[in-house]
Amino acid sequence: MLRDLGHSVEVTTVARDFDPAEEAAKVVAADAIIMQFAGWWMGQPWQVKRWEDLVFTRPEIASGDGRSRTDRTAIYGTGGRNTQKTYMLSSTWNAPLEAFNEPMQFFEAKGIDGLLFPMHKTFQFIGMRPLPSFIANDVLKNPTIEADLERFKAYLIRCFG
């Protein structure tokens, strides 16, 4: 889909072996990163976190936390080197949408971005700006795969078209 829109695409499957230096080079070269994952115990699977830990700690991605011993006004979390880049979190969940958005439901109306707040902060730490998150819900107990794929295609066109 993105290639059809004229974009170059690199894909990494974090459950397989990868070279952190090569992955960091991909991040440096990218205009945007899309993280696609299945929600797992209220967050991303451990393989995604492992990828973040091994790739985002490389010096070409972040140059510290942004603070300085000589400038007491420097703000924590501003040391990222990727300030011209964006990221997208795209996730699938077995929970229905109302579980995320309604106050009396499990996630207490926090929404997907509230649940994925730590991931958003990780990307902010390395300097990236968010695109709107995408979520496919109820994927096991009430799947609407074709409709979800159509929504995702329209979403990609909105963000990257």
PLM region descriptions:
Residues 1-7, 122:
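A short, Lys/Arg-enriched amphipathic alpha-helix followed by its capping loop at the start of a domain
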Residues 5-20, 134-137:
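A short beta-strand-loop structural module common to alpha/beta enzyme folds
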Residues 10-12, 34, 88-90, 131-134:
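Hydrophobic/aromatic beta-strand patches that form the interior of the parallel beta-sheet core
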Residues 17-25, 141-148:
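Structural motif
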Residues 22-119:
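Helix-loop-strand module that forms the ligand-binding subsite of alpha/beta enzymes
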Residues 106-161:
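Glycine-rich phosphate/pyrophosphate-binding loop and the adjoining helix
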